[in-house]
Design a protein with these regions (language model features):
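Loop-to-helix element that buttresses phosphate recognition and phosphoryl-transfer chemistry
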Residues: 9-60, 115-129
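Phosphate-coordination/substrate-recognition cap region in phosphate-metabolizing enzymes
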Residues: 37-103
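Extreme N-terminal starter segment of soluble prokaryotic enzymes
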Residues: 1-3, 49
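Active-site-adjacent alpha-helix immediately C-terminal to a catalytic or transition-state-stabilizing loop
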Residues: 11-12, 59, 67, 129-148
Length: 148
């Protein structure tokens, strides 16, 4: 079984800022509690591997979860956060006021997304599918956590 786990609450979430791949964005205290809860829930699943995005907030989530699962995590660039281009570190409200709902535009393949340097849905889909294929081939019949 492949379990996708989003990183726990991070500083940018509480500030309503789109962090993208920005380094140095850490979990909040609440985020650390959330990661602990996730780790406790995963304890019973006999997790054999944890792969994580290389961004700080995902690594911090993985560090906490991995202690509960007794498995060391490995970083993998195929799980990295969406590259948000020019929208990186912008407040959500400003993005929506100037560009509308960029998330819907991302999924629909709008050219406005790529024109602003945002990674396309197809690009994200390709790298995540590569990761899933890797996990299926390497961890047959095992429980694996992918932290994004």
């Amino acid at each position: 079984m492949i379990i996708f786990l989003r990183h726990a609450q991070a500083e940018n979430n509480t500030k309503k800022i789109l962090a993208g791949r920005t380094p140095g964005i850490n979990l909040t205290e609440e985020g650390r509690k959330q990661a602990e809860q996730a780790g406790k829930m995963l304890e019973a699943l006999d997790v054999s591997a944890i792969y994580t995005s290389p961004i700080d907030r995902a690594i911090q989530t993985s560090e906490i979860v991995s202690k509960h699962c007794n498995v060391e995590y490995k970083t993998d660039n195929r799980l990295i956060e969406l590259d948000m281009g020019q929208f990186t570190m912008m407040p959500y409200q400003e993005i929506f006021e100037k560009h509308g709902n960029v998330f819907l535009k991302f999924y629909s393949g709008s050219s406005e997304v790529s024109e602003n340097g945002v990674e396309t849905f197809a690009q994200v889909q390709n790298r995540v599918n590569e990761m899933v294929d890797f996990v299926i081939s390497k961890h047959k019949n095992e429980n694996v956590v992918l932290v994004t």
